Every structure is written in structure tokens, then in C-alpha cells.
């Protein structure tokens, strides 16, 4: 009897040791969006993937990076030896490649963030990294040297969403589109939310952001728009009293010519209006008199959109 009791006591004294194991550290999941149009010069991508390689080597803090590549890009470059070598020797070496057929860039986000989310756990952070910026320049290298601070803000401050803001002057086409197009339309359809969003950022369509696990789960389970998804996430964060922050990225660009074409400007404004109209209907269609209110807002929105296109046509020349 004494032997049995002693054995039991010894077993019980060892059992709690399992409970002393260190809790899992929340990780950051990098999601790289490969350029839809492969640039002839690989210097920007080479610099970007030097950073990705460093992230991949820090597995205690970062999950294995994911790179989303549109299948149309692969087919367009299937006979390009430099592309094939860079894909195999660099992209696949330092990240898991997700090949996907995508309507637009935001669908690439959806695929990549969805894959990362399924690998993640509560408390993790998901970091979107656009691949089509001039990272090979002196300014771009400086940005890459501190871009990791963006997801760290979400991780340390327990924010739901952190938006990265590109530094631009008042004549920059992206700045002009957001001022005269995006925010003007936001104030038309969602005035209260627009005022709140502007407290946090001047770039409601930014491609740089990081998002917390629980907030991403909520967003993934709702309608995902093929464009202007950052704006949609900001609207959701404001509506749910989420915690939003911003990070100043720096003066980098994804415009090789330095400015947008008029056709691109018009397309971006049209897309913004289309998303806002759809989102407003989804939120208000159960209310009394919503159809009449929608027609009034639609007329106002049309006037705002036309004015924005006219202003930007003159400013972007």
C-alpha cells in the first residue's frame, strides 16, 4: 500500500510540469502580393524579397511568408527565363507561393489573407505587403528597413487595423483622387463614418495594412469586394468601434510614369462609387423608406462623381 501511494504521489508531482510550458507567441503572417505586370527590371522585387528572406529566417516571430501570384501573370511570363528563375530561386525559396486566378488585386488579397488566416491562431496579425512599389530605390530600401513596424503596432497595441500611409505632396495623383473622389463620395454615402475615418488616415484605399486575427475573421466572412477593400474594412472598423491606427510608410510610389492616366482616375472613382452604393444598400435595405433615400443619395453621388472627374481631369494633365 505504501509503495502504491508513493508512486501515485510521484506521478502527481510531475504532472503540473506540462502546464509550465511557455504559451505560444502570437505571430505575424506576411502576405506578399506579386505584381500583376512583371517589371522588366527585377531590382525592386529583389530588394523586397531580401526583406522577405529575413522574415522567413525569423520563425519565432513570423509565420512562413505567403506570396500570391495571379495565374495570368504566370501565363504571360511562361517563356521568360528570368521570371522562372526568380520565381524558383527566390520567391519559392523564401515564401509559399499561392497561384490563383483573380479578378483584381483585392481578390489576390482575399486569397492570400484567407490562406494565412487558416494557418493562424487567435491573437495573430496578418500583414499585407504590395509588391509593385519602387523598393529598389534609396527611399524604397529605407521603407523596407522599417516596414516591419507596421504589423508590430497591431501586435503590441492590440489594434484591429493599422493603415500604412504613403507620403505624397498635394499634387500627387493618389492624393488628389482620395481628396476629390474617395472622401467626397464617402461623405455622401457614409458621412459619420467618413469623419471618423479621416481622423485616422488620409489614405482610405491604402495597399499597406495589418489586421488582427479576430477582425480579419469577421471581414473574411462578409462580402469581399474585388476593389477598394481597404475602404470597406475601415468602414467596418468604425461601425464596430474597432481600434484603428496608422503608420507612415514613406515617399515611395507604384507609378512608373509618376502619375495616373485619366482613364485610370475615372476607373478608380467609378469603382469607389459602385462599392459605396452596394454597401449602403446592404446596410439599409431593411429600413423604412430606404429606396427613396437611396435615390436621393444616388443623385447627389452622381453630381459628386462628375465634379471629381472634371477637377481631376484638369489637375492631372
Which residues does each predicted region cover?
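N-proximal low-complexity "stem/linker" segments adjacent to membrane-targeting elements
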Residues: 2-53
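Short, acidic, metal-binding catalytic loop of nucleotide-sugar glycosyltransferases
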Residues: 50-63
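A conserved acidic beta->alpha catalytic loop
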Residues: 68-83
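Active-site nucleotide-sugar/metal-binding loop of Leloir-type enzymes
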Residues: 110-125
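Acceptor/aglycone-binding surface of glycosyltransferases and processive sugar-polymer synthases
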Residues: 115, 137-210
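Short beta-strand-to-loop acidic/aromatic patch adjacent to the donor-nucleotide binding site
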Residues: 123-136
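Aromatic-glycine-rich donor-binding/catalytic loop that engages nucleotide-sugar donors
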Residues: 192-204, 209-227, 236-242
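C-terminal catalytic/acceptor-binding lobe
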Residues: 227, 231-234, 238-317
Amino acid at each position: 500500500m505504501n509503495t502504491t501511494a508513493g508512486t501515485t504521489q510521484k506521478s502527481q508531482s510531475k504532472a503540473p510540469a506540462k502546464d509550465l510550458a511557455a504559451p505560444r507567441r502570437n505571430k505575424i503572417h506576411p502576405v506578399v502580393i506579386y505584381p500583376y505586370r512583371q517589371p522588366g527590371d527585377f531590382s525592386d522585387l529583389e530588394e523586397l524579397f531580401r526583406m522577405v528572406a529575413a522574415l522567413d529566417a525569423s520563425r519565432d516571430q513570423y509565420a512562413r511568408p505567403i506570396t500570391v501570384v495571379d495565374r495570368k501573370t504566370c501565363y504571360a511570363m511562361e517563356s521568360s527565363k528570368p521570371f522562372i528563375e526568380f520565381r524558383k530561386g527566390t520567391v519559392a525559396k523564401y515564401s509559399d507561393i499561392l497561384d490563383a486566378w483573380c479578378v483584381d488585386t483585392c481578390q489576390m488579397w482575399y486569397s492570400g489573407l484567407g490562406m494565412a488566416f487558416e494557418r493562424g491562431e487567435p491573437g495573430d496579425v496578418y500583414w499585407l505587403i504590395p509588391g509593385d512599389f519602387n523598393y529598389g530605390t534609396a527611399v524604397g530600401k529605407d521603407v523596407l528597413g522599417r516596414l516591419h513596424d507596421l504589423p508590430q503596432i497591431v501586435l503590441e497595441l492590440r489594434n484591429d487595423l493599422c493603415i500604412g500611409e504613403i507620403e505624397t505632396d498635394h499634387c500627387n495623383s493618389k492624393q488628389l483622387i482620395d481628396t476629390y473622389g474617395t472622401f467626397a463620395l464617402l461623405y455622401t454615402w457614409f458621412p459619420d463614418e467618413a469623419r471618423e475615418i479621416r481622423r485616422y488616415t488620409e489614405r482610405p484605399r491604402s495597399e499597406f495594412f495589418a489586421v488582427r486575427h479576430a477582425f480579419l475573421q469577421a471581414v473574411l466572412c462578409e462580402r469581399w469586394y474585388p476593389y477598394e477593400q481597404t475602404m470597406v474594412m475601415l468602414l467596418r472598423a468604425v461601425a464596430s468601434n474597432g481600434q484603428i491606427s496608422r503608420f507612415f510608410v514613406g515617399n515611395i510610389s507604384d507609378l512608373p510614369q509618376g502619375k495616373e492616366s485619366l482613364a485610370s482616375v475615372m476607373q478608380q472613382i467609378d469603382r469607389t462609387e459602385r462599392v459605396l452604393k452596394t454597401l449602403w444598400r446592404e446596410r439599409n435595405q431593411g429600413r423604412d423608406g430606404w429606396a427613396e433615400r437611396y435615390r436621393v443619395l444616388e443623385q447627389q453621388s452622381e453630381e459628386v462623381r462628375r465634379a471629381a472627374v472634371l477637377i481631376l481631369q484638369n489637375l492631372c494633365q
